[in-house]
């Protein structure tokens, strides 16, 4: 025998930061053994957005079930695990608490190491299921609560080089969708409508020419709402496909142009797309096209659709990196809705 066999690392991931209750078993940080997600979309639909109290109640109902199902699908017991990773923040405090308390209880009962994970680090590490990371790399993180350009020079080293100064892109999508009378979650509906529309309204592209890599979407959102109201006051009903296409073109132009410029400036080896809005077809297609043209030497990594939204596999992936670096969280770990990525 040529030396000892390397032991696999098996981590249980738990995610409950917003409106998905999820658990997953991941091997070596890059192989999903099981992934279970209980979504609450139907419960929040009639309110047009996530209601924190309802989200927390659903997490309480689902958390034990999803953990049991993840272990069952992976065909493992708690004794087979090396550790537990859980989303510590950011997110809704009541929702986070359910996952954190479940993780702490299991870790205590089974004498397992506990690792707190930043939700956005999870979204970034979802790309580890596609390929190994090569540094330096740049992540465009786009979700309901975050729009950031994150530079990484090593594992678990995050530098935010650009972020939104007001609304996150996903938040703007949801608000615009509500104005059009579309069902929650609005981003998916806008993306679908945009496929059959044209950019006829030419909405503003904020901060495009500034040297900064920061974003702003509040002006675009206001411009969209005002345009829609003005047309309706004149008795006109605008083409929803064109409205959606015009809005999406503005968002995608800004996101892609700043990302490409940042990737060039920092001479990155890989460019990653991460977060819920990474599922947006318009954004995915445009990024693929621009990287081919502008950054032929840079590897573009886009996660599969199943790993764009909130899930626990990504938390286990990020948690594995921290676990192997020797990082541990104590039983005094609490939900931290304001947790900063650069502080982890």
Curated annotation (Swiss-Prot):
Cellular compartment(s): Cytoplasm
Binding positions for Fe cation per the UniProt entry: 119, 123, 310
CDD domains referenced in this protein's UniProt entry, alphabetically: ASKHA_NBD_TsaD_bac (cd24133)
Comment on bound cofactor: Binds 1 Fe(2+) ion per subunit.
InterPro entries: ATPase_NBD, Gcp-like_dom, KAE1/TsaD, Peptidase_M22_CS, TsaD
Gene Ontology annotations for the cellular component aspect, listed alphabetically: cytoplasm
Claim: tRNA processing is one of the keywords in the record: yes
GO function term, MF aspect, one: N(6)-L-threonylcarbamoyladenine synthase activity
Catalytic activity: L-threonylcarbamoyladenylate + adenosine(37) in tRNA = N(6)-L-threonylcarbamoyladenosine(37) in tRNA + AMP + H(+)
EC id: 2.3.1.234
Keywords: Acyltransferase, Cytoplasm, Iron, Metal-binding, Transferase, tRNA processing
Residues engaged in binding substrate: 141-145, 174, 187, 191, 280
PANTHER family xref list: TRNA N6-ADENOSINE THREONYLCARBAMOYLTRANSFERASE, TRNA N6-ADENOSINE THREONYLCARBAMOYLTRANSFERASE, MITOCHONDRIAL
Function: Required for the formation of a threonylcarbamoyl group on adenosine at position 37 (t(6)A37) in tRNAs that read codons beginning with adenine. Is involved in the transfer of the threonylcarbamoyl moiety of threonylcarbamoyl-AMP (TC-AMP) to the N6 group of A37, together with TsaE and TsaB. TsaD likely plays a direct catalytic role in this reaction.
Similarity remark: Belongs to the KAE1 / TsaD family.
Protein name: tRNA N6-adenosine threonylcarbamoyltransferase
